[in-house]
Amino acid sequence: MIRVKKSVELINPPSYGELLSTVERAARNCYQSENKITDGSAEKIIRFLINNGHFSMIEFADLTFKMVMDRATAMQLTRHRLCTFAIESTRYCNYNKSGEIKVIVPEGLNDSAYDTWYTSMLMAETAYMKMIQEDKVPTEVARSVLPQCLATTVFIHVNIRELRHILKLRLDKHAQKDIRVLVQELLELVYGMYPVFFEDIYEEYGEYSD
């Protein structure tokens, strides 16, 4: 059994300038004001759009991510149906080939609970391998014993309006800590690369707290 960490990676990231230009040109098309495009005008108009709730224009900017998370977190994230998802399938992936499963340690375990959790993970791994190796059942049946904290890779394609919505919901103190930690890393990444689109959210949630 391998313990892995949550992670967020941006796939084929567009430049900041490309996103700025796309959104500004779309917004200015509504008023035929393309002649007002200057150096620095894009950030100004995008900030105006966001501050005044005109979010449809930022839907023209989209991003693709590769994330590693536990299955329970993936179930929460895929509720955001304005995204496109490609999720590692436990029906077709055969973890017996590597001889072990990958898991993510849940947030909030104390020492005693960690020992119980670790023992349970080993039991689940053993049962899964036995069902495939000895009982000769297909992976779609053996997966029934896999844990919720099984590490899974998820590709996510999302426009920036929906991404902002996800960040606000999943960084709220009422969200489960496991998804908050993952989405905090996501916020740090996108704010660092595309600041004007996320500066208001970063101002509120830029530092994670329990």
Language-model segments: which ranges?
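Family-specific signature for flavin-dependent thymidylate synthase
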Residues: 1-210
